[in-house]
Amino acid sequence: VAQVLPAAPSPFPRPRRIGAMSSFKMPETPVIVAGGFGGPAVMFTVTPFRNGLTLGATNSAAGFMELYGQVFAKGFRGGWTGGIYPATAACPQFLCLGPAYHFYASFAGVAGGVFLTSVTETAIVYGAETCNAQMAKNQKSPGSIKNVHPSWKPYGPGFGIHVFRNIIATAGLRMFCTPCTWLIEKASGKSNALTTLGGDFAGNVCAACLSAPVHQLYNFTVTTPELGSLGMSEQKERMIQFLKDQYLETKDGRTRLSAVVPRDLFMRSMYVAVAYTMYSSLERALVANWPR
């Protein structure tokens, strides 16, 4: 008779059942620690990358080096202008990306967890990110935005765009990394910490590239105050025109992707892929090494 080995211990306690239709699992301590403390540190670290993207939304002519130069135009510390607001919001934001995602996924599945996490994340960080974007705009062009969006206000222009962007980014963290890791392991013939890190980064780069135009549309929306005085149809036309101006060019009667496309894909990857890969690596390390 074959011996039945005990199952490997789960990182989560036994599911608590509510009625007969659903169950959920509460995340363990290291996942909560990663979200509560690691998230703010990660989001503050990548502030210059986020500010560079913001400036790029209203400057399609500048290359990424020029945009990063503008970010640091007032000194090294100036690169972190407004970063305290997303960093503060990152505590509940990454509690959402980590513990809340695992909670949602335990009863709604991976796709449902990604959607619910993204909506919750937007409700938490929309105000802080919008405030940060407008402060970055004002640093480059003082007085451009007279009434900066309050960091505590969880709604405003571009809210739905923000949710859509987060769905793509969260999918990268929770859905794209595993197949990317598998491909790297198959190609290299190895499975170790480096292949896992590479898979995480590749998955997050994929999501960053897919979400880049959505993120820039959000930045355009929140740093263009005159949109608020336009009707819905006019706003839609301006947004479509922004995407065309940003990513398409016509030359010799032919329309093609503009040089801004690789710039924005690179800058979005530097922001999102670096931040989420740092976070996923920290979360994994804490779960593996936390005292039992």
Where are these regions (language model features)?
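Flexible extramembrane linkers and terminal tails adjacent to transmembrane helices
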Residues: 1-38, 53-68, 76, 96-165, ...
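The first (N-terminal) embedded transmembrane alpha-helix
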Residues: 35-42, 87-95
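Alpha-helical transmembrane segments of multi-pass membrane proteins
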Residues: 41-54
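Hydrophobic transmembrane alpha-helices of multi-pass solute transporters/permeases
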Residues: 47-48, 91, 95, 268
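Interfacial helix-start motif at the membrane-water boundary
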Residues: 72-90
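Aromatic- and glycine-enriched pocket-lining scaffold segments that form the walls
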Residues: 170
